[in-house]
Amino acid sequence: MLLSDRDLRAEITAGRLGIEPFDDALVQPSSIDVRLDCMFRVFNNTRYTHIDPAKQQDELTSLVEPQDGEPFVLHPGEFVLGSTLELITLPDDLAGRLEGKSSLGRLGLLTHSTAGFIDPGFSGHITLELSNVANLPITLWPGMKIGQLCILRLTSPAEHPYGSTRVGSKYQGQRGPTPSRSYQNFITST
């Protein structure tokens, strides 16, 4: 069940749904607008000949932070990682879904490629997979509205929420745009 504005406010007031910093003006009829943080991860195209999800490639991306008051310019065809300004904390019976903003989509900005789902139990900043599919560069301003977070109530609490030792929660507690840890999916125990 998708939570309404009144349910979202009630969950935040009760301390069950964490959104820091919280601004009530960002609450929409069935979502909460989230804003863009000031850090980005750009791909180092000259360090590797290809991307291998099975290998740890620490130098695949570099952290970039525009100077105060300056935007980040995303050029046509480029893909970078960003993150939400807000720290999101979900209890074991609420899940999240991050969607892009329609106004930005109409400019050619994609907010996420595939990872729009947030498991119950997650706590951290949401990493954004930002792509420019337009023919012109797009300026990304830290603090701008970048997406909308929808919250869904589960039919029962998750038995093993994200962050529990059984799940293997690679991104729990992440701060800023966090690079892929897909290589951990290939690690086998002997």
Swiss-Prot record:
Q: What class of enzyme is it?
A: hydrolase
List the Pfam families.
DCD
Question: What GO annotations for molecular function exist for this entry?
Answer: dCTP deaminase (dUMP-forming) activity; dCTP deaminase activity; nucleotide binding
Which UniProt keywords are given for this protein, alphabetically ordered?
Hydrolase, Nucleotide metabolism, Nucleotide-binding
Q: Keyword check for Nucleotide-binding, yes or no.
A: yes
Q: Where is the composition biased (Polar residues)?
A: 171-190
Q: Which reaction(s) does its UniProt entry say it catalyses?
A: dCTP + 2 H2O = dUMP + NH4(+) + diphosphate
Q: Does the keyword Lyase apply?
A: no
InterPro entries (alphabetical):
dCTP_deaminase, dUTPase-like_sf, dUTPase_trimeric
The lineage's top-level taxon is Bacteria
Which pathway does the record list? Pyrimidine metabolism; dUMP biosynthesis; dUMP from dCTP: step 1/1
Q: Which residues carry the site feature described as Important for bifunctional activity?
A: G116, F117
Q: What is its EC number?
A: 3.5.4.30
Q: Which Gene3D superfamilies match?
A: 2.70.40.10
Question: Could you say which residues bind dCTP here?
Answer: K101, S102, S103, L104, G105, R106, D119, T127, L128, E129, Q148, Y162, Q174
A biological process (GO) of this protein is: dUMP biosynthetic process
What positions does UniProt annotate as the active site of this protein? E129 (proton donor/acceptor)
Annotated stretches, region: Disordered: 163-190
Q: How does it assemble?
A: Homotrimer.
Task: Fetch the NCBIfam families from UniProt.
Answer: dCTP_deam
Instruction: Name the PANTHER family for this protein.
Output: DCTP DEAMINASE
Similarity comment text for this entry: Belongs to the dCTP deaminase family.
Function summary = Bifunctional enzyme that catalyzes both the deamination of dCTP to dUTP and the hydrolysis of dUTP to dUMP without releasing the toxic dUTP intermediate.
Its name, as the record gives it, is dCTP deaminase, dUMP-forming
